[in-house]
Amino acid sequence: MAGLRGNAVAGLLWMLLLWSGGGGCQAQRAGCKSVHYDLVFLLDTSSSVGKEDFEKVRQWVANLVDTFEVGPDRTRVGVVRYSDRPTTAFELGLFGSQEEVKAAARRLAYHGGNTNTGDALRYITARSFSPHAGGRPRDRAYKQVAILLTDGRSQDLVLDAAAAAHRAGIRIFAVGVGEALKEELEEIASEPKSAHVFHVSDFNAIDKIRGKLRRRLCENVLCPSVRVEGDRFKHTNGGTKEITGFDLMDLFSVKEILGKRENGAQSSYVRMGSFPVVQSTEDVFPQGLPDEYAFVTTFRFRKTSRKEDWYIWQVIDQYSIPQVSIRLDGENKAVEYNAVGAMKDAVRVVFRGSRVNDLFDRDWHKMALSIQAQNVSLHIDCALVQTLPIEERENIDIQGKTVIGKRLYDSVPIDFDLQRIVIYCDSRHAELETCCDIPSGPCQVTVVTEPPPPPPPQRPPTPGSEQIGFLKTINCSCPAGEKGEMGVAGPMGLPGPKGDIGAIGPVGAPGPKGEKGDVGIGPFGQGEKGEKGSLGLPGPPGRDGSKGMRGEPGELGEPGLPGEVGMRGPQGPPGLPGPPGRVGAPGLQGERGEKGTRGEKGERGLDGFPGKPGDTGQQGRPGPSGVAGPQGEKGDVGPAGPPGVPGSVVQQEGLKGEQGAPGPRGHQGAPGPPGARGPIGPEGRDGPPGLQGLRGKKGDMGPPGIPGLLGLQGPPGPPGVPGPPGPGGSPGLPGEIGFPGKPGPPGPTGPPGKDGPNGPPGPPGTKGEPGERGEDGLPGKPGLRGEIGEQGLAGRPGEKGEAGLPGAPGFPGVRGEKGDQGEKGELGLPGLKGDRGEKGEAGPAGPPGLPGTTSLFTPHPRMPGEQGPKGEKGDPGLPGEPGLQGRPGELGPQGPTGPPGAKGQEGAHGAPGAAGNPGAPGHVGAPGPSGPPGSVGAPGLRGTPGKDGERGEKGAAGEEGSPGPVGPRGDPGAPGLPGPPGKGKDGEPGLRGSPGLPGPLGTKAACGKVRGSENCALGGQCVKGDRGAPGIPGSPGSRGDPGIGVAGPPGPSGPPGDKGSPGSRGLPGFPGPQGPAGRDGAPGNPGERGPPGKPGLSSLLSPGDINLLAKDVCNDCPPGPPGLPGLPGFKGDKGVPGKPGREGTEGKKGEAGPPGLPGPPGIAGPQGSQGERGADGEVGQKGDQGHPGVPGFMGPPGNPGPPGADGIAGAAGPPGIQGSPGKEGPPGPQGPSGLPGIPGEEGKEGRDGKPGPPGEPGKAGEPGLPGPEGARGPPGFKGHTGDSGAPGPRGESGAMGLPGQEGLPGKDGDTGPTGPQGPQGPRGPPGKNGSPGSPGEPGPSGTPGQKGSKGENGSPGLPGFLGPRGPPGEPGEKGVPGKEGVPGKPGEPGFKGERGDPGIKGDKGPPGGKGQPGDPGIPGHKGHTGLMGPQGLPGENGPVGPPGPPGQPGFPGLRGESPSMETLRRLIQEELGKQLETRLAYLLAQMPPAYMKSSQGRPGPPGPPGKDGLPGRAGPMGEPGRPGQGGLEGPSGPIGPKGERGAKGDPGAPGVGLRGEMGPPGIPGQPGEPGYAKDGLPGIPGPQGETGPAGHPGLPGPPGPPGQCDPSQCAYFASLAARPGNVKGP
């Protein structure tokens, strides 16, 4: 045991060393998911696109953005629109999330105009990728990419502009729609043209190329260009072709290092195998591999490599973990593709079959694999062999090596001939490859009907070419032929001198593009390239054009610098009311403004909320002085405005002034009914331009203007500041299947840690299930040559590991002769971790785990424990399923204000435009500067009183009222539920019955059922425990002999005897028959997640150990917290490996818990069927000391006797006559197992005899064997409190008891179901203020309350909705006279108003009375179940009944059913989970190794994979063995032979040993003196006694005092109440 513990500690230290060094290096994964871009969309918004199609463009941009990870440090997106000139819609750095960019894309505005693509290309080259516009420095982390979308030919030149963009490092993808010229698109796009040009027929089709464009974008950024011969691919002309990919022959310099060989029939090739071909992955794939690619190679096996297992190509990381590989298994004739998985460690596909077998001959073959997102296809010799599905792959880690041609198990270079090996970044190229480079390949020689380009005239005979099948070119010499017909158009000439502007002719059909002509030579030769000219002077302004069509509303520009304060403009029409704003604090007093001109009469303003006629208010604060105008005629009565902000006034009463100038614009209110329209005033002069307003709603389309003459092209204007995003567009067309989504969170397997020091060897683990064959590990460093070791034990065949990196090349040695087979070397160090095995079959159920810590006893129902400490952050979850398409987000907040644009030149004054429809109200403008103070206006006329307003809306809830008077007492409540049974007063013990006859020998009992074995495991006094939990079923015994004994004759019934003195406590009875398994209880509420458990000990417990532990533990088991996890269930799906947990500190030894209270006994279960006999166990070692024999009555403890020799099992004798118990003798030797007896047949039930006279109390006899369950007897007297027993099996629900006395409140139980609504209870006292509730539904209108007292003046209210015209109000009090105002212009004559009657101020009303009670509230949730009530008063003692007649001994019952595995699992969890940890830790600490023999446990389920171990120290080099062929994985071998028997250890302290079989009954001892013990279970009824005389009934005792119930004891009293009446004692 000590050795095991030492090994466990060493193993833990070793794991800690490995784990603590695990944070050193992060994997650097590279691929499509890790490349980010500065991406600019260049969108044609010319007139040929049209508004409807531009809507599809907006949606296309949004859909394409959805395939990128957008963020400040990820991909940034900008948009530039162009037609006549380019403008920036939004810059690269403006939006930081995908949703913001998509929303902005859907708001892009359409311009219309010409198509100047060249100008747009120059614009993005100079501006869009600059740091000022959000661009980032160009490096390999951020790629500058532009995607151009156009639908027509450019009206300026594009070639030079595109070349400048390419030189600046901008990769351009050109997408043409409809009539866009492919030749022009190719001039614009980057190389290779075929990968950067897309063309679709119309705008409906642009979304179909979205996925293809996204893949090309990744491929072309990750992959360099490779030049290949044209005859490599089908459907192409001869010559060279540029495509994206990796030519591994060039990248590894294979031909330069190994030298090339020529074969006349084919291309040159290289003979591999003499030197390892290895390169750093960062040098080969600096950006990783694309998501889809094609691997193509032309090679042939050599004699030595045909049957090898090797990698033709492999990428490994810095820890030699494979990232991607292609394996050729010569022995099994298979091709295997492996890669790192996104959801699992590795994914792979294996190709086998007759067509794959052909690859392994010694001919030349072309092998191509097309690796796509969800499948892999294998092509051999240009024919598709098979397509297999594959799971999602992860990007490769580029911090490692890439190898060509190495053996799997030792990384030795492989001998084979290699002609070419290339990776194309387009997976389709695997099927486009031809086989013309294979001598025997299917390359048909057929002449292509397409003629070659015509040769130049007067060409002498030269070698020509003809096209053949698969476009293989064959050179031949041809004489010049006769003159042919006129050839196709010649190449385009040099540009001619610029001609005059001609009239625009009709659009001609596009002609074919001519080939580029030779550069012409001028008279002085070709001149040098001139310097770039300066910007030209601005051209003269063109003539004013005719009025154009009304344009679309422009994008909102950024706010310009504030202009000078303009003159006050004419009063505009009233805007729509804005939404009510919050009440602001009163502003500072403004200075007096200059006198303004008299404004026109405004339209009718908005009324406030209608109110009831109020009392005459106190005098309001003086309003601000208005601009005085001349006396006009009396106008209409205006609506009552809110109180104004206090103005600067002289504190004297003045007359009412004229209507003031309009105040500052209020927040928009809800729309009111239209007011009466005032007369139209004279048109005011144009004011200076105000501040830039916010964008208005789109106006109606104006009438088409007269087309204007084409003006001269002006110089490009300065760049405008970007406007805010426009409103979202309508949903676009459904997109095609999207590009693979963003990478999920990192997988569970972390990166391997740094190399730590070599730790001590770990302890041997339990034998796991054999995994799949792994790949070979790296070869260790060669150690010193060791001596040949002795023959080791035969080990299991190791799994095949993955080959490691090749070592440095050695000099080729002289080939030696074949040596003799060496002796078997010592076992080598373990190899590195192989690939993760696939999911194995379900392993056998492991033993139960070690228990959790015990808690002190808590009564039922179990309360949740205190919240554990916060757990450490869990591993990231698996990526979730893609969510449903979200609804378009709301408009994002306005972006930050950009820098002010350069001030433009003042434009010529345009002709006035046609009057547009009134615009929607603009947002509140910035407040203008304060004007000088205005003069006091003249007093206004008294207004007419307003009409009564409408009834106001329901006011806010008042504050909580004072508590009302206590209501009358309610009706009596419904009868309560029956309470628990009351506790009776302790009665006197009854008379002791006669001893029963001994019963027949029973079958072997389970845990805790054999007398004397309950508490003797640790020595000391044996006290009978209560009934234990059902043990694990033993093997069934054979049928026992029938019992002996004859029932006595029934005696006559005697009268009841006098009350006897209390007898001494009887001996324990045998346990009764096993009750049925209780039904599963309702599942408890899930508890809080606990802290990580302490690590368990390494040894496992067998079922036998569990028996013994349960036997020891079950005697003193308080009900604890929830038990340990149950036995393993069916094997689940393979989980994601978790990170290794930190090692917890070793817990201190816990003290033994206090004795628990007994649970209520269960009801007897149904009889079970006989189980099958179990298999014989292994022969155990001889035990040092057996368990004590059947104990007699309690005597003084004797000294342990010496171990006796093994006795021979004697035949079981008949039961002896009962003797008196003797003193406890020394334990006898353990006998062999007796043969199982044959169960007797069930006898008929005997008839009840007449009661006999009471006999004399006899001495306590030996307890009889368990008899059949008798009829329920009368309740006995209360026994003494016994020791706490183990909880019995869960019983079924008992019947409802009678109502008990009111108990103390219990702890909160779980929420019960909602009960029926009870009668209304009496009114309770007022509660405290509760926390604010959630807003309720609007209630019904209440009855009008009485008039309240007048409140104080409120702050100015918000503008109200337009109300109906009110009645004339009372005249206000005389106002303070204002200052003299400047006379205004004459106003329009107003309508005469009517004078209203003055109102009378009412008195203050009395306070209103208390309102009516509200409706009953919604029924509350049912409260928690209360605590158990206090103990009821004891009932009166009943009279002692006469003893019942003893029945005849029954025959043994049939064997009970074995409990179900579910019941066993639950019982073991409940029993072992309570005290096992502290007891087990204590026992293990006390035991010497000799007591820890345990039976072989079953293997547990496979644990999570550990981290990769460090390479072990170099071992001594063994003698070279003959390399064997890698065999397939064999079945697990049989368990090896048992080791030699160890020496006998010293006797240790009593421990948990394996339990022996039940020995034969010992010789009955002498009767002992009566002892004191707990009451036993009822024995078998004795023979019928004579009938005794009837006794006098006793007087009922006085009632006892009311009991008190400690909450911790409630479960105990509940168990008493639920006990059967015939059970004595606790």
Swiss-Prot record:
Restrictive expression is observed at tissue junctions such as the myotendinous junction in skeletal and heart muscle, the articular cartilage-synovial fluid junction, or the border between the anagen hair follicle and the dermis in the skin. It is deposited in the basement membrane zone of the myotendinous junction and the hair follicle and associated with the extrafibrillar matrix in cartilage. The lineage of its organism: Eukaryota, Metazoa, Chordata, Craniata, Vertebrata. Residues 1-27 form the signal peptide. It is found in: Secreted, Extracellular space, Extracellular matrix; Cytoplasm. Residues 481-520, 526-565, 566-625, 657-708, 714-773, 774-833, 868-922, 925-984, 1047-1095, 1118-1155, 1156-1215, 1249-1308, 1315-1374, 1387-1446, 1495-1550, 1575-1604 form the Collagen-like domain. PANTHER family: COL_CUTICLE_N DOMAIN-CONTAINING PROTEIN-RELATED, COLLAGEN ALPHA. Residues 544-553, 591-606, 769-778, 815-826, 945-957, 1131-1151, 1173-1185, 1241-1250, 1391-1404 have a biased composition (Basic and acidic residues). Residues 506-1002, 1019-1103, 1119-1458, 1491-1609 are annotated as: Disordered. The keyword Ubl conjugation does not apply. Keywords: Collagen, Cytoplasm, Extracellular matrix, Glycoprotein, Repeat, Secreted, Signal. The keyword ATP-binding does not apply. Glycans are attached at N375. This is Collagen alpha-1(XXII) chain. Residues 38-213 form the VWFA domain. GO terms for cellular component: basement membrane; collagen trimer; endoplasmic reticulum lumen; extracellular region; extracellular space. Residues 571-580, 715-728, 742-751, 1440-1449, 1595-1604 have a biased composition (Pro residues). Belongs to the fibril-associated collagens with interrupted helices (FACIT) family. Residues 239-427 form the Laminin G-like domain. It holds the Pfam family VWA. InterPro entries: Collagen, Collagen_superfamily, ConA-like_dom_sf, TSPN-like_N, VWF_A, vWFA_dom_sf. Acts as a cell adhesion ligand for skin epithelial cells and fibroblasts. GO terms for molecular function: extracellular matrix structural constituent conferring tensile strength. Residues 661-670, 908-939, 959-974, 1056-1065, 1205-1223, 1260-1275, 1379-1389 have a biased composition (Low complexity). The gene is COL22A1. It comes from Homo sapiens (Human). Residues 1405-1414, 1521-1530 have a biased composition (Gly residues).
